[in-house]
Structure formats: C-alpha cells, structure tokens
C-alpha cells in the first residue's frame, strides 16, 4: 500500500501542475494605472504561484500580479506559456512603496527565495518559461540587478554562477484570473504544499523583519 500511496500522490501532484492548462483571458498591464510614487519591479523566478505568494507577504508591497513577460507574442495564455509554445516566462509584477521597501530589498528577496543558478528550470518545473530573469524599468534598476548578481557570484553562496537574465522591461501580460492569489485560494493543492510553502518559509526565515503583520503568525 505504501508504494501505491506514493504513486497516487505523484499522479495527483502532476495533475495539479497541469490542471490549469486551459485557455483564458490575459490583459496587458498599463503601468500608468498605478499611483504616483509607486515603484514597479518585474521578476521571473519559476512558477508564478510561488513568487506571487512570496512578495505578497513583504511589507511595503501593495500589489503583486502573476503574468507573462519577456516574449514577443501578444495575448499569451497559460496553455501556451506553460507548454513552452511562446518565448514568454511566467513572471510577477510588483507594485511597492519605495518609502517602506526598497528595490534593492526586493532584489535580495528575489535572489534568496529561488535558485538563480538553474538554467531554464526551477525545482520540478522545466523549460525556458520557468527561467530566472529580472526586467529593469530604469537604468538604476539595471545597475542594481547587475551589482547584486556580481556580489552573489563573488560570495561563493552558490557553486555555479548566477544565470539570471537581465533585460529591459517591455510588456507584461496579466495571467488569467484563476492564477491571481492562487496560493491563498488553493492551500490544499499538492504543488502549493510541496513547492510553494517551503519557498514562503524561506522568506520568513531570511527576512523576518520584512513580513507584513497579518502574515507573521502564519504557519
């Protein structure tokens, strides 16, 4: 029975990863819709269910959107992106208050909560759509990203070099509605339990002073 149980868990886990591969509506995000003074950060670090949940818990972050960026196709869908049928990556766009949390602090969290040395994969997810990338909105952001990568490589934190792509921001397509707040709305999903929750715990371990009050008691 133990062997059968393990097989069933594996099947359920794999189904949970692919179950969302259905067509839906995506929206092109207009950056001018945010309040004056807001900062914008755009990162790709594997499955956006994980990265969205991480940054939603960071003090000073006002909104996090899951979506697609870094590719050339218009109106990409989850079905297309998740199966590698576009040049886009799963990504998140963060709206933050720079008076509370700096772009550098967001960068530090980004690099600490995923493996930036893995090329075209993160954990169980494989393919260029799960690549690590940081999309800069200004020259200051570009310099901060490059300096952070250089610092990480020099530190010897990882055996391999950082492969995070540093690219100018172009467009961000917001993912289908059912992907937004996926972590919060699907706590029993095997992928959330096995992959996303450990990443959120890593955030809390390394950045305890940056957690929003409402998430401090979260297990």
What are these regions (language model features)?
Residues 15, 19-219:
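Flexible coil/turn and secondary-structure edge motifs
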Residues 2-18:
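Bacterial N-terminal signal peptides
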